[in-house]
Amino acid sequence: MSQDSFKSYILKKFNISFNDESLLTEALTQRNYLNEHPDEKGRDYQRLEFLGDSVMQMIVAEYLFKRYPDWHEGQLTEMRIAMVQTRSFAHFSRMVHLNEGIRLGKGEEMSGARDRDSLLEDIWEAFIGALYLDQGADVVRQFLNQTLFAAIDTDFFDRFIDFKSRLQERLQTKGSVDIDYQTEKEEQLSDNTQLFEASVSANDKELARGTGKSIKDAEKAAARAALKILEDNVNL
């Protein structure tokens, strides 16, 4: 996908058209490209990445504050950290085809940089920085509503949350509690993968169960289910 094709895509998909197209070009330009094109004016993406990181932090914090009025500071902080982890940004860069619009040097292109997570994480932040400078925070919010924020309802960010530690902190607020995880069931699936069921108990009282394709994932699912029960029943 050329830069012109990418511009057409974001216009059609997100109704985004840059007023200053040099900002978009800068956000999608890697340093090695400029090294190989010394006659070309402009910068690489790194300054916009710096700005985009701060914009993401602010807008995500504001979004969570408004969406979850009953959450305490610890819950808001944990979810914000999960959402602005750069590990998730590579996923969203691919989702909106930022990877296809990057201007790379020949060596980086040949080495597979276009699909390198670390670069895609940086480019996401640079794109957010460019969009903020060009059109302001409201347009950034609209874009994130269609991408990052929409993923909350799919439980996408659960992979970045340590539910076992959260459960331990919740249960031990009033003193020591013996928390135990047990593998209750193991099932062989038709695609040769395994499905595990795990339980979590506190002081020998089972709180919840969860399933996953590994024991670790099943225990995490059990902890998440237990937290949900505790949060829905504050007197437990």
UniProtKB/Swiss-Prot annotation:
Disulfide bridge map: none
EC annotation from Swiss-Prot or TrEMBL: 3.1.26.3
Cofactors that this protein relies on: Mg(2+)
InterPro entries named among the record's database cross-references: dsRBD_dom, RNase_III, RNase_III_dom, RNase_III_sf
Cell location: Cytoplasm
Record: active site: 53, 125
Record's keyword terms, sorted: Cytoplasm, Endonuclease, Hydrolase, Magnesium, Metal-binding, mRNA processing, Nuclease, RNA-binding, rRNA processing, rRNA-binding, tRNA processing
Keyword rRNA processing: yes
Lineage top rank: taxon: Bacteria
Every DRBM domain range: 162-232
Protein name as annotated: Ribonuclease 3
Source species: Leuconostoc mesenteroides subsp. mesenteroides (strain ATCC 8293 / DSM 20343 / BCRC 11652 / CCM 1803 / JCM 6124 / NCDO 523 / NBRC 100496 / NCIMB 8023 / NCTC 12954 / NRRL B-1118 / 37Y)
Name of the gene this protein is made from: rnc
